[in-house]
Each structure stands twice: as structure tokens, then as C-alpha cells.
């Protein structure tokens, strides 16, 4: 893939997603970052780090940075993307079971936003057990 002609989307701008998105931007890709939190998106748009990770503080792109787009709308971002990485949380419930609701919701939003006939690559980067992608996303295809 040629960075100059490839657009990467990152769904979830937390501890994993934000540094991942910044890494792709630094490598020359156009990047669309998406988070459902308006507060997170507003903070990133201001060029500030919403994660609390001090290693990321000086890395967040300044407002107006070329090739850097941040939104709360998966539907807005995904049609622009050649590759979409889903980096949403997978917390554990009170009974110590993985909560896959974020994975399912993000997958649904991505697949609904994909234009027909597209060859977009969609990657689940969240920490999950074997079979989760087939279990949560395959029925959506």
C-alpha cells in the first residue's frame, strides 16, 4: 500500500486507537479517527490528549493538520477509508465475562457505512478471544 494514496480509519481513540492513528498519520497516510465520545473528539480536535497517557501528550496533531480528520460519525469517516481498524474496549462484566457490546456496535456501524462494492479492509484490533470476529461480525456481512 502506498501511504500517499491510502486512507486509514481508526474506530476508537483511546489508549490503543489514538497512538495507532497518530502512527499512521506520521507514516504519511490520510487518517480518519472516530470515537463515540464527543468529549474525546473535541479534545483530540484541539490537539490535546484525552487518554491520560503522558507518552501521547506531545504526539496529538495540532488543529488543522493536513490528512488528519476526527469525528464522532463512523458513517462520515468509513466511506473515505481503504482500511479500517477497530480499537474499541472489551471490558469484563461483573461476572467476569467479556463485554463484546462495543465490538458488535462498532462492527455494525462500520459495515453499515461501507459503500457497496468496496474492497475496504476491516480489522478488529481489540483484545478478544478466538472466534469473536466470526461470532459478532460475520452475521453482519
Model region roles, listed by residue range:
Residues 92-141:
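Rossmann-like NAD(P)(H) cofactor-binding subdomain of soluble oxidoreductases
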Residues 21, 25-26:
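Gly/Ala-rich phosphate-binding loop of Rossmann-like dinucleotide-binding domains
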Residues 33, 86, 122-124:
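Structural beta-sheet core signal
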Residues 9-12:
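Conserved N-terminal Rossmann-fold NAD(P)-binding element of oxidoreductases
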Residues 19, 79, 132:
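Residues that form or flank phosphate/diphosphate-binding pockets in enzymes
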Residues 2-5, 30, 36-83, 89-97, ...:
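Conserved N-terminal Rossmann-fold NAD(P) cofactor-binding segment
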Residues 4-7, 119:
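Phosphate-coordination loops involved in phosphoryl transfer and adenosine-cofactor binding
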Residues 16:
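Hydrophobic/small residue at the entry helix of a nucleotide-binding pocket
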